[in-house]
Amino acid sequence: MQCYQASCHCGAIKFSFEAEPFKSGVRCNCSYCSKRGTMISLVPGEKFKFDAQEGALGTYQWGRMQAKHHFCKNCGVSTFSETTRRPGQYIVNLGCVDGVDTFALEVTMFDGKHLL
């Protein structure tokens, strides 16, 4: 396991977690992910911590309300999500994670358009 640090663009939201080194990331084609264009990964929640400046953390939900998609209200960056489908885990935007080059990772496609 490796400790990772992450943040939104303006730094108002910071988060850290432990995970295995990233070799791949996921691209989802659901209606939300296809619009935000992020590469994501599921990480264990045991050591996930976040800190946000007051009023900076926004949350978006829609449809069946199964997921909470968190973003920075200052810079607009999608940071991480929580879902009832994966309790105790977080879905992180790998573009926010320090030292992770998303262009160097293998891409796994998730057909959220049909499976969610």
Question: What is each of the regions a protein language model found here?
Answer:
Residues M1-S7, A12-L116:
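A short Gly-Trp-Pro
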